[in-house]
Each structure stands twice: as C-alpha cells, then as structure tokens.
Amino acid sequence: MQTMKANVFRGPNKIGIEEVPRPSAGVGEAVIRITLTTICGTDLHILRGEYPVKPGLVIGHEPVGVIEELGEGLSGYKIGDRVLVGAITPCGQCRACLSAQWAQCGHGEGVEAIGGWRFGNTINGAQAEYLLVPNAQANLAKIPDELSDEQVVLLADIASTGFSGAESANIRIGDTVAVFAQGPIGLCATAGAKLIGASLIIGVESDPVRMEMSKRMGAHVVLDPTQCDVVAEIKKLTGGGADVAIEALGLQVTFENALRCLRPGGTLSSLGVYSGKLQVPYDAFAAGLGDYKIVTTLCPGGKERMRRLMSMVQSKRFDPLPLLTHRFKLDQIVEAYTVFGSRREGCLKVAIMP
C-alpha cells in the first residue's frame, strides 16, 4: 500500500504530520499531487474544537496541484495538468447546483456539513501530499501557464468568499460600503467592493499591518474601532448610513455594528463564521420595519468560478500575492498553524509546500 504525508486532526488542539494511505481515483474522481496549499481561519475553528469534524481526518481545503491519476468518465484532462480546485466541490447535478447555488451542493452530508464543503470536513483534505477530488469534471480548473501556484492558491477560498460577499450584497455603482474586519477574507471583500464599483469603501480594523493592507486592497478610509465610535463615524462619512456593510469576522459585536451602521434599506452581507449564538437587537433593525436585508454567503466553488477568478488575476484586476506573507514546508505544519493563528510577524496567509 502506498502512503503519503498528511496533516491529521486527532481532536481539539491535536494535529500533526502522519503517514496515511495514498488515495486512488474511482469513477469520476481524480488524484492530484499537491504543490501548494494554505491554512484557513476555518481550519483554526476545527483545531480549537469550535467546528466538529471526525478525528483522523486530513484537514485543509485550498488545493493547487498536478493531476496524478484520472478515474473513468473524465474528459478534457491529462496526467500532468496543473489545476486549481475550489474549497467547495459542487457535483453539478443536484437541485442546488441546477439552481446555481453551487455552494449548497449536498447540504446535510456528514458531521454538520455545510453545503459543498467536503475537503477537510467530510472527506480528507488538502494539507497532504496527494488529494482525491470528487466530481472532478466539475471541479478541476486548469491553471494558465503564465500564472504561478502562489498567484492562484488564495482563489480557492478567501478570494471566492470575499468577492462573493460583495456580489451577494448587490453592490451598485457608487454605493458606500463598510467592511468590518480586514483579515484575509475581509481584505478580499474590500477588493471585491472596489472591483464592482463602490464609491466609498470604509475598512474597520485595529491591527496596523491589516489597516495598511486594507488601503492597498481598495479602502478609502480605515477606522480603528479601539479609537473611535465606528458606527457614528460611518454614518458621518456616508451621510446617514452605508448602503452595504460586510461582516467578515464572525463576532456578535461586529455583526451588530455592521447592522447599526446601515442606512434604512441597507444590506448586511455576513461572511463571518460564528462560534456561538448570534442575536439581532430589536432596535438595530428598527423592530423589523427598516427594510434591511441580511444575506449570508458560503464560498462559491466549481471550475467555472475558479476560471473566472483566475482571469481576474491574469488581467491584473486583482493581485492576491500581497496577502501571502509566510511560507512553510508541510513538515512544519504545526509551526505554520501557530504563526497563522497568532498573527505573528504580521501574518495574513501562509503557503504550505509538500
């Protein structure tokens, strides 16, 4: 039996590199040799026991690699093709997929599975030397020769999620947008709001490194919530309230502030992953009479979504490389989690290379 190195979750705060069986491709599946992956904030939730997955699972859900094996039923691919696979792997055939709700494919699978999020949730994930890709025809996106692995790895999740937060909010040309938290996803939401055409983008962040990166990604103003009343400042800057607020942290306080900073009829786009109960204060949405909209988003996946995101990088409309601040080998995965989780040395995202 062939084996490989992989980062295995063994319980809260217990991960590490182990030798595990190497996957083989069945019908409609492919095996890719991982050339680059990363760590997501959701992986931290898993590590801390805040999101339940089964012990023994290989975690990680942001894979870039080379096709090593193709199962029966696949066409248009060959061994050796460089591919990007989204964090969400839609089947392309179910009711959700046929309704263009790709992220909700297979809702209800596994242990509290969320839609089409399978890697590192219900099946083995990408922090390994090899990865089995289900529904490969719908999910293997070929990488253009002129793009490097580092240019595309963040498209699998944080760019797709952040952009989707802006898209789901239906930002219109000239809208005012406040983005709460400028972590990796919030920064991508800021970039997405800029690309769509917001006239004023207000970032909310207290970390100096992230405040500066927020401006680089497109924020016109960045407010430090430890130094001012951000709701009052946003209302002042926007003349009464933002058209759109994007919440990208997953805390009660940021959700509530995002709701309170809106104009009547405004939209709150929620991207954060919440660990506890979330409450909507009676007065924050005018007792239900303020025409507010609250929308939620799970990272869109599938090869067409990945192709579109890669085209944005290829045309130089979006540059994700500044977000990739640290690099580690797979054998250093525990250290990588520590650096990423503690934001040490201004860490935003880490590259993991087998």
Each model region followed by its residue ranges:
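A generic alpha-to-beta junction signature in SAM-dependent methyltransferases
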Residues: A169-I171, T238, L249, L262-R263, ...
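Glycine-rich beta-strand-centered segment in the early N-terminal region that forms part
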Residues: P21-T37, R48-L98, A103, I123-N124, ...
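Mid-domain Rossmann-like dinucleotide-binding core that forms the NAD(H)/NADP(H) cofactor-binding site
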Residues: V83, K142-C228, A232-E233, V244
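Short SAM/SAH-binding signature in class I
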Residues: G240-I246, G266
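Generic hydrophobic/aromatic pocket-lining and core-packing "Φ" positions
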Residues: D43, A166, T190, M211, ...
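NAD(P)H dinucleotide-binding glycine-rich loop of Rossmann-like/cofactor-binding domains
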Residues: G76, Q93-F180
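C-terminal hydrophobic helical "lid"/dimerization subdomain
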Residues: M1-Q2, A6, G240, E256-R260, ...
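Glycine-rich phosphate-binding loop and adjacent beta-alpha segment
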Residues: A198, K215-R216, H220, Q252-F318, ...
